[in-house]
């Protein structure tokens, strides 16, 4: 049984590090039985006064993109599998064509292509979010390197259900890799 103090400390931590405001929007993709989803797609947003939109179907890329296009969330909270599936099916195949591989080796063109891919991905996620917070499982290193290479606004939090769930998190602008965490969640649950 997770004590209420653990849930409260996660909610307080979210207030300290996230910048949601009353009226901001979030698409909830994770089940409420998932501690990560409960803490960071419901409890915090509910306490802030955000509008929470629940997906009523299995979160496939098509359903997710339609919801993001309609709602334009201010924050995206997801598990790695969802982000990995989207990138592996919709982005990487386009970049792995023979012509694109050659263009990606040309310095100035490489930067333009990466900027275009980054902008298209931001628009696919609604175009209005500050960052995507990924957590709940390990992140694929190939996908993480790709996101870093295009300067995509994402971060990876680390946690476990027994901690209700967050252990540490870093804002995307300071986040380097999932191996280097710098901001542990404070724990005073007395």
Q: Model-found features: residue ranges?
A:
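Gly/Ser/Thr-rich phosphate-binding loop
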Residues: 74-77, 87-175
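Conserved AMP-binding/adenylation subdomain of ANL enzymes
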Residues: 8-25, 32-119, 153
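Structural motif detector for alpha-helix initiation sites
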Residues: 3-4, 61, 186
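Conserved AMP-binding A3 loop
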Residues: 1-9
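Single conserved hydrophobic/aromatic residue that forms the stacking wall/gate
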Residues: 181-190
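Thr-Gly-centered strand-to-loop micro-motif
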Residues: 29, 55, 134-135, 178
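Short acidic capping loops at alpha-helix termini that bridge into adjacent secondary structure
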Residues: 22-24, 176-179
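Transmitter module of two-component histidine kinases
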Residues: 26, 36, 169-170, 183
């Amino acid at each position: 049984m997770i004590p209420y103090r653990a849930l409260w400390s996660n909610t307080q931590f979210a207030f300290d590090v996230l910048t949601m405001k009353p009226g901001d929007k979030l698409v909830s993709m994770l089940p409420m039985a998932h501690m990560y989803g409960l803490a960071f797609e419901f409890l915090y947003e509910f306490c802030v006064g955000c509008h929470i939109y629940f997906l009523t179907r299995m979160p496939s890329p098509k359903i997710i993109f339609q919801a993001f296009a309609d709602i334009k969330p201010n924050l995206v909270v997801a598990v790695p599998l969802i982000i990995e599936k989207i990138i592996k099916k919709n982005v990487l195949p386009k970049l792995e064509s023979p012509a694109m591989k050659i263009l990606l080796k040309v310095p100035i063109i490489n930067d333009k292509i990466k900027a275009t891919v980054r902008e298209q991905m931001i628009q696919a996620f609604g175009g209005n979010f500050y960052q995507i917070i990924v957590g709940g499982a390990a992140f694929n290193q190939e996908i993480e390197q790709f996101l870093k290479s295009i300067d995509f606004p994402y971060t990876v939090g680390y946690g476990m259900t027994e901690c209700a769930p967050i252990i540490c998190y870093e804002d995307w602008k300071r986040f380097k890799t999932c191996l280097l965490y710098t901001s542990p969640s404070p724990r005073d649950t007395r």
